[in-house]
Design a protein with these regions (language model features):
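Conserved alpha-helical scaffold segments that buttress catalytic/binding sites
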Residues: 100, 104, 115-236
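Calmodulin-binding IQ motif helices
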Residues: 239
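Metal-dependent C-N hydrolase catalytic cores
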Residues: 2-146, 152-153, 205
């Protein structure tokens, strides 16, 4: 079975501004490096379809989604750093659709595994809020599709982005079908290191200058026992 590569053209066409960290160039660079290394010939490429309303509302409240649509019509900001335009909101729905379809293809046996290469990002978006360039939590949409539609009893969401997955924690805290393991730079956005809010969440703040091998050693010591005990049917890694 092949590895799936899920993406969409909106990733490359909409910019949040010259000072934004979420820029089309980061997706372009991945495509360029894949072509240079011949990885592109070893994956099956899928152009994402937009997520359904049901996919989105398993994660976000109707009021929040309406707020995003209202802001998009004005081209207004959700937070100081997070712009909402029709194009960015369309991209967020496509990114969620890519994540859901990737999980569906893995679970039905069409693919061995999948890489979802999309923007805008999502893990700072909670049930009723967004921020940090995140509008829709695409990983959360994929997890909820897996547990509520596709038959998974347990899903592990492993987040190793430099920033804390505050949106994902807001969505999944207390959900016994999901194990959230989150490592992040302790001094980075969203600022302040709060303890995990539920037993199914493990936060691993890392000090500035932590080496990769040091972080890996902590993950092996603190996370692997939890993963073995949880025995997930599916694991998602947010990078």
């Amino acid at each position: 079975m092949a590895t799936g590569f899920f993406t969409h053209n909106r990733c490359l066409s909409e910019d949040e501004g010259s000072t934004s960290l979420d820029r089309p160039e980061r997706i372009e660079q991945i495509h360029t490096l894949m072509q240079a290394s011949a990885l592109a010939r070893r994956v099956q490429v899928y152009e994402a379809k937009t997520a359904s309303e049901a996919d989105i509302l398993r994660v976000h409240s109707p009021e929040y989604i309406q707020k995003l649509r209202d802001l998009a019509q004005k081209g207004a900001a959700l937070t100081a750093e997070t712009l909402v335009t029709p194009e960015l909101l369309e991209g967020a729905f496509l990114s969620a659709g890519a994540a859901v379809e990737a999980v569906r293809a893995v679970l039905d046996g069409s693919l061995k595994n999948a890489f979802v290469c999309v923007r805008p990002p999502g893990h700072h978006a909670g049930r009723n809020f967004g921020g940090g360039f995140c509008l829709i939590n695409s990983a959360a949409c994929a997890v909820r599709a897996a547990t509520q539609v596709l038959g998974c009893r347990r899903v592990a969401l492993i987040d190793v982005d430099a920033h804390r997955a505050d949106g994902s924690e807001n969505i999944f805290a207390g959900d016994a079908s999901v194990l959230l393991l989150d490592s992040f730079q302790a001094t980075a956005f969203p600022y302040g290191v709060a303890p995990a809010t539920a037993a199914n969440v493990t936060n691993m703040p890392l000090d500035d200058g932590t080496l990769g091998r040091e972080a890996l050693a902590r993950m092996e010591a603190e996370w692997l026992p939890r993963l073995y005990d949880f025995a997930p049917d599916l694991s998602l890694i947010h990078i």
